[in-house]
C-alpha cells in the first residue's frame, strides 16, 4: 500500500494508517502531510510493538490487551497526545486507548509514553469509526473523549464532522451503562450541532441539562487547540453526557464535575 504520509522524503512508519478495502464512507478527517522527524520514525520502529494496536477488523479482548480487567477510556483524535498523556499520568487505575490518523502526532505520543514508562496506554493509527465498529465490543468502554474535533467550518463540509447521529448511536452502543461521553469544541456552530445530535440521542443524558455545558473538568488539560481558539476569540464548550436514563448525576450549567479518583 502507498503510504499517504510522505514528507521531506522521510521514511514513514511501518504501521501506517490503513483503509479497509471495499468500503466507501464520508470521512471526518483528511490525511494531511506533516513533518515526520527521525525521533518519531524511531518511535514507530521501536515503540509501536509495545504501545501500538494494528487494525485487524476483528473483535479485540481489551482486558487481554492490557493484562487486567480495568475500566477502559477511549480518546478519539488525540492530536499531539497532550491530553491523553496527562490523563494516563494522573489516572493509572484505568486503561487508555487513543486513536489518531496523523502519523507525527502518534510518533510524538509514542516517545512521551516511553519517557513516562506507561503500561496502561495503547494506540491505534486508524479510522476511529472502523475501530469502533469492528474491534471494540458493545459496552466495553467506561468513557469516550473527543476533544476539539475538526470543525469543518464551511457549510458544505459540515457533513464531514465527526459528531453525527449515526456516530452518536455507535458511541452509545460501545459505552457501558453509566459510562460517560466528554466532547469539547471551540467552535460555537459545532457546539450547536453537538447539542442537536447528542441531546437527541437515545441513551445519552446531558449532565448540564438540554443544550448545557460545564466548565473545563480537571481531567482535561488546556490544549494548544484551545489556546489558539481563545486567541481568536472563540469560546470553549465542554459537553458531558451519561450513558443512562436517570438524571441523578446532572450538573449545573458551567459547573465543573469532580475529577475521577
From Swiss-Prot:
GO biological process: RNA (guanine-N7)-methylation; tRNA methylation
Catalytic activity, EC: 2.1.1.33
Residue numbers binding substrate: 154, 186, 223-226
Enzyme class: transferase
Entry keyword annotation includes S-adenosyl-L-methionine: yes
Residues noted as binding S-adenosyl-L-methionine in the record, renumbered to the chain: 75, 100, 127, 150
Active site residues according to the UniProt entry: 150
InterPro entries: SAM-dependent_MTases_sf (IPR029063), tRNA_(Gua-N-7)_MeTrfase_Trmb (IPR003358), tRNA_methyltr_TrmB_bact (IPR055361)
GO cellular component: tRNA methyltransferase complex
Biochemical pathway: tRNA modification; N(7)-methylguanine-tRNA biosynthesis
Record's keyword annotation contains Membrane: no
Keywords of the record: Methyltransferase, S-adenosyl-L-methionine, Transferase, tRNA processing
Catalytic activity: guanosine(46) in tRNA + S-adenosyl-L-methionine = N(7)-methylguanosine(46) in tRNA + S-adenosyl-L-homocysteine
Region (Interaction with RNA): 156-161
Domain of life: Bacteria
Example GO molecular function: tRNA (guanine(46)-N7)-methyltransferase activity
Protein family per UniProt: Belongs to the class I-like SAM-binding methyltransferase superfamily. TrmB family.
Primary role: Catalyzes the formation of N(7)-methylguanine at position 46 (m7G46) in tRNA.
Protein name: tRNA (guanine-N(7)-)-methyltransferase
Species name: Xanthomonas campestris pv. campestris (strain ATCC 33913 / DSM 3586 / NCPPB 528 / LMG 568 / P 25)
Amino acid at each position: 500500500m502507498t503510504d499517504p504520509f510522505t514528507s521531506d522524503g522521510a521514511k514513514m512508519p511501518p504501521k501506517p494508517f490503513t483503509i479497509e478495502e471495499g468500503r466507501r464512507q464520508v470521512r471526518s478527517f483528511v490525511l494531511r502531510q506533516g513533518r515526520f522527524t527521525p525521533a518519531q520514525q524511531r518511535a514507530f520502529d521501536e515503540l509501536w510493538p509495545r504501545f501500538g494496536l494494528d487494525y485487524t477488523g476483528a473483535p479485540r479482548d481489551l482486558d487481554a490487551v492490557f493484562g487486567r480487567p480495568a475500566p477502559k477510556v477511549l480518546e478519539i483524535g488525540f492530536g499531539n497526545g497532550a491530553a491523553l498523556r496527562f490523563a494516563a499520568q494522573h489516572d493509572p487505575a484505568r486503561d487508555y486507548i487513543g486513536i489518531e490518523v496523523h502519523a507525527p502526532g502518534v510518533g510524538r505520543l509514542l516517545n512521551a509514553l516511553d519517557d513516562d514508562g506507561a503500561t496502561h496506554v495503547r494506540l491505534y493509527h486508524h479510522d476511529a469509526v472502523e475501530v469502533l465498529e469492528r474491534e471494540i465490543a458493545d459496552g466495553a468502554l467506561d468513557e469516550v473523549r473527543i476533544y476539539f474535533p475538526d470543525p469543518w467550518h464551511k457549510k458544505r463540509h459540515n457533513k464531514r464532522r465527526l459528531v453525527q447521529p449515526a456516530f452518536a448511536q455507535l458511541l452509545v452502543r460501545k459505552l457501558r451503562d453509566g459510562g460517560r461521553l466528554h466532547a469539547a469544541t471551540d467552535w460555537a456552530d459545532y457546539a450547536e450541532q453537538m447539542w442537536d445530535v447528542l441531546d437527541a440521542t437515545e441513551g445519552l443524558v446531558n449532565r448540564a441539562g438540554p443544550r448545557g455545558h460545564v466548565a473545563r473538568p480537571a481531567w482535561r488539560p488546556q490544549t494548544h487547540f484551545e489556546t489558539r481558539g481563545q486567541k481568536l476569540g472563540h469560546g470553549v464548550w465542554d459537553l458531558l453526557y451519561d450513558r443512562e436514563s436517570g438524571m441523578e448525576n446532572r450538573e449545573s450549567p458551567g459547573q465543573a464535575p469532580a475529577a475521577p479518583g
